[in-house]
Design a protein with these regions (language model features):
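PAPS-dependent sulfotransferase catalytic domain
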Residues: 1-182, 195, 209, 228-277
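Short, solvent-exposed polar/charged micro-motifs at secondary-structure junctions
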Residues: 105-107, 190-193, 221-222
């Protein structure tokens, strides 16, 4: 796949196949319900993890959805063509995911009471995860060397554009108590506490026992063994897991946020690159 073959939607680069002009039009005309819950992420920031977490929290620990329904059907992407095929099968409250920046959300979202869980992730981890994903996904551009891929990332010449623009669009959205910001890192460090924050935000009074059950079933080990979640159902012609595993255990990286909370730095060898501008 070459960059020239990516679908350009209002300046946003998207991979063809899963995204079509029709699916994007459907997303813009989508009727958002007040009870809908959106997990919003920049690519490679915990989307699949949230597709595991959301149905378990919304269904108070019932494992049936995550054991019987592929993650892309149980919590579908707003912008992908699959949504049209499964939307009528989604139970209420509906869980959905999207990589859209805020300004790309449908008008019905902005007039609804739908809630958003925005998952933020260390940008260096995003780059590394995305780099490996590009190596295994045949529908994406060849990433080249890691140095070249970092340059593309900083330029926004990657799926869904610049990370900083995505993050700022949601940080600046005036959604009040409709949005919860949570980090991938706090989920890694203490998943039960993160699940408690999510369940409280969604108005679920889950017991400690249910929280532990959800945490156990959303662990790296459990998800890696779950065919409904590890993307092993996707044909090799689209994802070659011999080149890289889709679920890769997070090892942590060198990053920091300045005391002003407005600048992020990315350590690339001895080089520091400012990402927030």
């Amino acid at each position: 796949m070459s960059w020239a073959k990516y679908l350009q939607y209002r300046g946003l680069p998207l991979p063809p196949g899963a995204h079509t002009e029709q699916s994007l039009e459907y997303a813009q005309n989508f009727s958002v319900e007040d009870t809908d819950v959106f997990a919003v992420t920049y690519p490679k920031s915990g989307t699949v993890w949230m597709q595991e977490i959301l149905p378990l929290v919304l269904n108070e620990g019932d494992l049936t959805p995550i054991l019987t329904i592929p993650n892309w059907d149980r919590v579908p992407w707003l912008e992908e063509k699959r949504l049209q095929e499964v939307v009528d099968q989604l139970p209420s409250p509906r869980g959905l995911v999207t990589h859209f920046p805020y300004q790309f959300m449908p008008p019905s979202f902005k007039t609804s009471s739908a809630k958003v869980i925005y998952v933020m992730r260390n940008p260096k981890d995003i780059i590394v995860s995305s780099y490996y994903f590009h190596q295994m996904a045949t529908f994406l551009e060849d990433p080249g060397t890691l140095d070249k891929f970092i340059d593309k990332f900083l330029q926004g010449r990657v799926l869904f554009g610049k990370w900083t623009n995505h993050l700022k669009s949601w940080k600046r959205a005036e959604l009040g108590d409709r949005i919860l910001f949570i980090t991938y890192e706090e989920m890694i460090q203490d998943l039960p506490s993160a699940l408690r924050r999510i369940s409280d935000f969604l108005g679920k009074n889950l017991s400690d026992e249910v929280i532990r059950k959800i945490a156990d079933n959303c662990s790296f080990k459990s998800m890696q063994a779950n065919a409904m979640s590890n993307l092993s159902l996707i044909p090799k012609e689209y994802m070659d897991t011999e080149k890289s595993q889709f679920l890769r255990k997070d090892q942590g990286t060198c990053w920091w946020v300045s005391k002003y909370s407005t600048m992020f730095s990315l350590c690339n060898g001895g080089q520091t690159v400012w990402l927030w501008n």
